[in-house]
């Protein structure tokens, strides 16, 4: 599954194989619990879990309908490859129908899926399941003859189904992932030879009788016929051992181990005709010592069995009698190791079936052991049965008792009641339990804490007194009493302090040097004065306000008019070509042009800085001084008002002609019209 490490690929694979999976507690596919939980992923998993619950319910309904269709045909033929049995009568030796296991071991698919209709049983205290590559399914075909002996001498496959019940990380089937859920339904093999106290499972063979001698192996254990069969179930972390005892025969050695069959809550279907586990899987381990008796029965199981199964002493097989077909099969070959499956459901076990063990005569292909016959007596229930407590953790998974029995002897399909009007079979249901909700992440907790702190600060101060955030501590500035503005920035009164002495600088002179703020004393005596500006006029350090003009720095007291000596801080000023500073009034008085007519300086009008003057013959005139000297006509550029100078005098055209008629001087004749 390396290629499905990526959650996206694994989700895509799950969608493709949707019908191969069942919903589980962990969700739809594997989730890395160590990784941080993604809220989007959790929401997606919940949505898929809801959909899978609906799909699972539909599948359960379809299986229930299929079971209802199968029940009426139970008396006409075998169900799911089961044997068709004759009328309920005790058979003589060699006259019963024999259950034959044909085919060889075949490794299961990668998904290890078991067809619906097969009941998988596990026993407490038995070995773990085999590896997946060695698993095989055993399908048993029964004889179609109801009252005659098949006479089949074919070699039978000895099989056994048992599993140790050891605590695992999660014993609830809803806790298993989809792949593990089916893998854990794999086949198991006991370790008899190593541990004589291990409860043997169910074994099936031909050519074996009942033996009371040591070294014999118990064979298939059959439950007594009872129309009220119940589904044995167990919960996670606890188990109830369903065990039955068998009184010894004349040989006194027919003691059996606790059967301890646990029936899973999942119904599987198996198809007849598939190969079963063969002897190529290895020789069957045999016990060298007789089994010590051990009796246990489920709670409230006190009534005697209503029917007993006779045993055969001819060595040709085990005989099964009953009015309804009851196909029996052990779907697990014998292996030593493998994964364990811990499956649980909610209803307590109340099956009155008695389990007894017959011993296998020989491996497939071998004849029956001589002298291993023993008259069979029907199984009985021990009143002094040991009851193991069971705790149900999933009460919602319980099904109605008495409706059907999930075979505790490893048989295929549900055990059908022997009455013609059998009740409906209700399949066990399994609900999807969503995973626990994960708490908020560290980033969410930090964001929530910051938000709450900001809300507390906003609630502690009126919103009208909020000025903004301090550039030094980034906290809000509330109230004018602690607000300080300097260099265009907002500070707390306690944040705007001298970098050297930490004194508050609100309302005091400060010096900003290299990104730090200093008070005047620290600035003067800490060596920073070397970087201070010097006045352009006096040449001294500027320790107070700095006035910059024309690219130079001045003390405010040094920046004065050279004429009136008035301080020009905040007052319009001008300079001449010699860099002398003048106020505007003195500048015009000193540097303003003089009128050629009246000889006075031409100054700007009151309230204005602009000077209006008339320039004629390279001379400057006031506007009111530029007129005809004879008639006083205002001269300008209009027609009839043009100036006609004569001998450096200003005249209009008529006055100019008159001056010429009187005999102008030769100098006046050379005048040109302007």
UniProtKB/Swiss-Prot annotation:
Please name the Pfam families in this protein's record. Answer: LIM
Sites where Phosphoserine occurs are at 147, 235, 241, 271, 276, 314, 422
Q: Where is the composition biased (Polar residues)?
A: 144-161, 232-244, 303-316
- Give start and end of each LIM zinc-binding domain: 468-529, 533-593, 594-662
Keyword flag Repeat: yes
Designated gene of the protein: LIMD1
Region named Interaction with EGLN1/PHD2: 188-259
Q: What is the protein name stated in its UniProt record? A: LIM domain-containing protein 1
**GO cellular component entries:** adherens junction; cytoplasm; focal adhesion; nucleoplasm; nucleus; P-body; plasma membrane; RISC complex
Q: Could you state what the record's PTM comment says about this protein? A: Phosphorylated during mitosis.
> In which organism is this protein found?
Bos taurus
**Molecular functions (GO terms):** metal ion binding; transcription corepressor activity
Residues of the region (Necessary for nuclear localization) are 470-674
- What protein family does this chain belong to? Belongs to the zyxin/ajuba family.
| Residue ranges of the region described as Interaction with RB1 | 402-440
């Amino acid at each position: 599954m390396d290629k499905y490490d990526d959650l996206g690929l694994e989700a895509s694979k799950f969608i493709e194989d949707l019908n191969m999976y069942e919903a589980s507690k962990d969700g739809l596919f594997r989730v890395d619990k160590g990784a941080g939980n993604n809220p989007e992923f959790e929401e997606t998993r919940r949505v898929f879990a809801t959909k899978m619950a609906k799909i699972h319910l539909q599948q359960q309904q379809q299986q229930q309908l299929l079971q209802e269709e199968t029940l009426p045909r139970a008396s006409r033929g075998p169900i799911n490859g089961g044997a068709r049995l004759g009328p309920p009568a005790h058979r003589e030796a060699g006259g019963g129908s024999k259950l034959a296991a044909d085919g060889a071991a075949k490794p299961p698919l990668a998904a290890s899926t078991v067809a619906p209709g097969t009941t998988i049983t596990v026993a407490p205290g038995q070995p773990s399941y085999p590896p997946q590559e060695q698993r095989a399914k055993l399908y048993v075909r029964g004889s179609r003859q109801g009252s005659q002996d098949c006479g089949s001498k074919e070699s039978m496959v000895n099989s056994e189904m048992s599993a140790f019940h050891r605590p695992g990380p999660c014993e609830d089937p809803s806790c298993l992932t989809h792949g593990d859920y089916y893998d854990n339904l794999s086949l198991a093999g006991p370790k008899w030879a190593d541990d004589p106290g291990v409860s043997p499972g169910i074994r099936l063979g031909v050519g074996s009788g009942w033996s009371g001698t040591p070294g014999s192996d118990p064979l298939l254990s059959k439950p007594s016929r009872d129309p009220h069969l119940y589904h044995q179930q167990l919960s996670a972390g606890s188990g109830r051992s369903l065990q039955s005892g068998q009184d010894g025969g004349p040989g006194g050695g027919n003691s059996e181990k606790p059967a301890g069959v646990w029936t899973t809550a999942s119904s599987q279907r198996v198809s007849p005709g598939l190969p079963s586990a063969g002897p190529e899987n290895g020789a069957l381990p045999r016990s060298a010592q007789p089994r010590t008796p051990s009796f246990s029965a489920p709670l409230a199981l006190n009534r005697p069995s209503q029917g007993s199964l006779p045993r055969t002493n001819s060595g040709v097989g085990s005989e099964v009698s009953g009015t309804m077909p009851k196909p029996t099969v052990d779907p697990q070959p014998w292996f030593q190791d493998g994964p364990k499956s811990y499956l649980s459901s909610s209803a307590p076990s109340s099956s009155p079936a008695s389990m007894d063990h017959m011993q296998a005569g020989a491996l497939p292909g071998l004849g029956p052991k001589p002298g291993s016959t023993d008259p069979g007596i029907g199984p009985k229930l021990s009143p002094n049965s040991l009851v193991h407590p069971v705790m149900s953790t999933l009460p919602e998974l319980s099904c109605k008792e008495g409706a059907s029995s999930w075979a505790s002897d490893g048989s295929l399909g549900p055990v059908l009641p022997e009455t013609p009007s059998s009740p409906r079979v209700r399949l066990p249901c399994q609900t999807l339990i969503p995973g626990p909700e994960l708490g908020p992440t560290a980033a969410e907790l930090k964001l929530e804490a910051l938000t709450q702190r900001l809300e507390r600060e906003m609630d502690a101060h009126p919103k009208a007194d909020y000025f903004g955030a301090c550039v030094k501590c980034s906290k809000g500035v509330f109230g004018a009493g602690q607000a300080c503005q300097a260099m265009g920035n907002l500070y707390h009164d306690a944040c705007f302090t001298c970098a050297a002495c930490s004194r508050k600088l609100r309302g005091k002179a400060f010096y900003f040097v290299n990104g730090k703020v200093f008070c005047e004393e620290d600035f003067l005596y800490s060596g920073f004065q070397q970087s201070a500006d010097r006045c352009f006029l006096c040449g001294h350090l500027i320790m107070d306000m700095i006035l910059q003009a024309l690219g130079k720095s001045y003390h405010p007291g040094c920046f004065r008019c050279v004429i009136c000596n008035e301080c020009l801080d905040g007052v319009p000023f001008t300079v001449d070509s010699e860099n002398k500073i003048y106020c505007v009034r003195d500048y015009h008085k000193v540097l303003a042009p003089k009128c050629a007519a009246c000889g006075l300086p031409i100054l700007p009008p009151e309230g204005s800085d602009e000077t209006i003057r008339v320039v004629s013959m390279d001379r400057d005139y006031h506007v009111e001084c530029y007129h005809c000297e004879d008639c006083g006509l205002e001269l300008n550029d209009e027609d009839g008002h043009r100036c006609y100078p004569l001998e450096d005098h200003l005249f209009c055209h008529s006055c100019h002609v008159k001056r010429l008629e009187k005999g102008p001087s030769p100098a006046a004749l050379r005048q040109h019209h302007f």
